[in-house]
Structures are given as structure tokens and as C-alpha cells.
Amino acid sequence: MLRVGVIGVQGAVSEHIEAVKRAFERLGVEGEAFWLRRPEQLNAIDAIILPGGESTTISRLMQKNGLFEPVKKLGEEGLPIMGTCAGLILLAKEVEGAVEGQRFLELLDVRVNRNAYGRQVDSFEAPLKLSFSDEPFPGVFIRAPKIVELLNDKVKPIAWHGDEVVGVEQGNIIGLAFHPELTDDARLHEYFLRKAL
């Protein structure tokens, strides 16, 4: 049985839990998706999702709740972790526009610009190309970060908006600038969960 924790300190948690449940069904696997708030919940976990929200707040609360270092260590050891929007920022090695003193997990060798797509009013939806599917994916961008640079060839693009890379993977780590959990399309959650099977 797969156990998937969604970091539940702030952000779009319930939508990710529902998307993971849809992905379990599509994959035909038994699984449990839950809000991850305390370090002891990391025992016997198979995958972690870092949701959207506000990256500075999520980073601070993860540190306060004792989740930051254990999650970083699990990611370094190969546990599958997916970050969406603010979660991508937390995973990034380098962040433009970071708040002073903000800590990052630094599990993805990318440079991101924190609020490249502007304010809430600059949010948009657009069809995205995926590396593993011919069908376009409905991309929902809300004050999204931008992937400015892939820092080495270990980082592979998996999603594009036109010519722009908006999703990447590096080993078992996935970072997405958009919100797949705000659609009914579970393909990206399914792709992520395959890393934990």
C-alpha cells in the first residue's frame, strides 16, 4: 500500500489529496494520501508532495514543525518528492527574488524566479505539452514561479508552455510551476506515483 503525504502546513492540500486518490484509481493500486504535519508521520512514507501556497511561509512552518531537515534528507536519499508552484520554489537550488533568510530544500538543480508571472490577476490557464503523453495537459498558473535555468543535464524537462519549460524532473524529484491538482486530469500525479511503485 502506497502512503503519500502532502505537506499540510499551508497551501492547496485537499486538492492534492483528491488528485492522488484519482491517480491511485488509474494505477489500480491501494494507497493512502494524508496531510503531513509532523516528523513522526514520515515513518514508512512512500512519497511527498509540496503544495502551492506561499513559499516563505511553508519553509518557515516546515522548520518550526521539524519537517524541513527530515524531508530534505529523504529527498537526498531518493524518496519521490513533487513540488507544485511554491513547492517548486522550495525544491530549487537557486531562487531569484527570495526573501532574506528563506531556506530551500535545494533538491532540484534549477534556478527559478519566485513570482515571475506576477500577481493573482496575472494568473492564467494554458494547454501544456508533456514529455510522456501526446494529449495536452490543462496548465493552471497562479502567481507562478518561472524556471529560469536548468543548472545541469541531470534535470530533464517534462512539461512545456510553448517553448518555455514549466515542469522538470531530476531522479525522483519533480518540480512544476503550475497546479495540476486544480484540474481533473491526474496524469502528472500518476506519473509521479509511478516513481514510488
UniProtKB/Swiss-Prot annotation:
Q: Give the CC-aspect GO terms.
A: cytosol; glutaminase complex
Q: Which UniProt keywords apply?
A: Glutamine amidotransferase, Hydrolase, Lyase, Pyridoxal phosphate
Gene3D superfamilies (UniProt xref): 3.40.50.880
Q: Which reaction does it catalyse?
A: aldehydo-D-ribose 5-phosphate + D-glyceraldehyde 3-phosphate + L-glutamine = pyridoxal 5'-phosphate + L-glutamate + phosphate + 3 H2O + H(+); L-glutamine + H2O = L-glutamate + NH4(+)
Binding-site positions, L-glutamine: G53, E54, S55, R114, I142, R143
Subunit and partners: In the presence of PdxS, forms a dodecamer of heterodimers. Only shows activity in the heterodimer.
- This chain's protein is named Pyridoxal 5'-phosphate synthase subunit PdxT
Naturally occurring in which organism (per UniProt)? Thermococcus onnurineus (strain NA1)
Gene designation per UniProt? pdxT
